[in-house]
A protein has these predicted regions:
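C-terminal nucleotide
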Residues: 3-7, 11, 18, 26-27, ...
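Short glycine/proline-enriched turns and hinge-like loops at secondary-structure junctions
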Residues: 29, 124-126, 162
Length: 313
């Protein structure tokens, strides 16, 4: 039996612009997903994916020699159907095999189980943790596997592989990962609130590209400023200055993607600062506040609220 574990992810700075070289601050979470592989006699891959509660949400059987789907079961009303997920999984396995032809080269088969430690709709990296663990199993580069089978910046792979916050940047089409120390003195005033509106990363990237074409004239200046804000996140000593950085960051991204910042859109009467994390419009937001913060958001109908220490690895 082999066990592979990958951390979940949150992108604190540089959403969208990380794709064009901005230095971004990413943090691994205490939540993640493991992948357990056992050898079996049948020449098949028997796959089972389990939620954080232990419920099986996806099952599939693949013919090992031909790498073809035999059958699948999808026990969820979210995000597509079983065959789509099975084909996506098959694409990842096939790409890993192209990268390492000895992967899955066996007369015997495999029983594979994946186990999430967070709800699937949290957006902490159900796909990225899977890709990173498959890459470890196949002994291939996880960033290349991501880029060959999906799209995305790769910051989530950096989080999957590191147990500390990282600066993540794409330079000359290659990932540059630098572990950093991000331990703000005001972390007691930081919260993560889930908006319960799962965002599609591919769709978010596509929309960003559309808007980017219209904003090319000053995009390099904005990338430079976002990189500076990422640096400033590590050095800022007061909550007030941190909030000012959040507001500026939100304004810069808003000017590019032509969407209202989340505070302006949903919480204009909130007393603290709010920052979108990743694709705007869903999943978690970073919130500054105090002891009254959980009550405010619960009264608005947002009940999944985690303190900084509960989320960050």
């Amino acid at each position: 039996m082999k066990n592979y574990y990958s951390n979940g992810k949150l992108l604190l700075t540089g959403e969208y612009l990380v794709l064009d070289g901005a230095k971004s601050l990413a943090i691994p979470t205490k939540f993640g997903q493991d992948l357990v592989v056992e050898n079996i006699q049948e020449p098949q891959i028997i796959w089972g994916s389990f939620t954080h509660t232990g419920a099986c949400w996806f099952e599939a059987v693949f013919d090992l020699q031909k790498l073809r789907l035999v059958n699948c079961t999808f026990n969820s009303d979210r995000e597509g159907n079983g065959e789509v997920i099975a084909e996506t999984l098959l694409d990842i396995l096939e790409e890993a095999k192209k990268m390492n032809p000895s992967f899955l080269k066996s007369e015997n088969g495999f029983m594979v189980k994946t186990n999430l430690t967070f709800p699937r709709n949290w957006g902490l990296g159900t796909s990225s943790t899977l890709i990173n663990s498959i890459a470890a199993w196949a002994k291939v580069d996880a960033f290349k596997l991501l880029w060959n089978s999906f799209k995305g910046s790769g910051y989530d792979i950096a989080c999957a592989q590191n147990d500390t916050p990282v600066f993540y940047q794409i330079e000359n089409k290659k990932p540059v990962v630098a572990p950093v120390k991000f331990n703000p003195s005001f972390k007691e005033n930081l919260f993560f609130v889930h908006l319960n509106q799962k965002q599609d990363s591919k769709e978010g990237i596509a929309k960003f590209r559309e808007h980017l074409d219209c904003a090319r004239h000053d995009i390099q200046q904005k990338i430079k400023r976002i990189s500076e804000i990422s640096d400033a996140f590590l050095k800022v000593e007061s909550l007030e200055k941190f909030e000012a950085l959040i507001v500026e960051h939100e304004q810069i991204i808003s000017s590019i993607i032509k969407l209202k910042p989340v505070k302006e859109k949903l919480f204009p009467d909130y007393f603290g600062a709010i920052k979108s994390l990743g694709a705007w419009g869903g999943d978690f937001v970073l919130v500054t506040g105090n002891a009254d913060t959980p009550t405010y958001f619960k009264n608005k109908g947002f009940t999944t609220i985690l303190r900084y220490q509960e989320m960050v690895l």
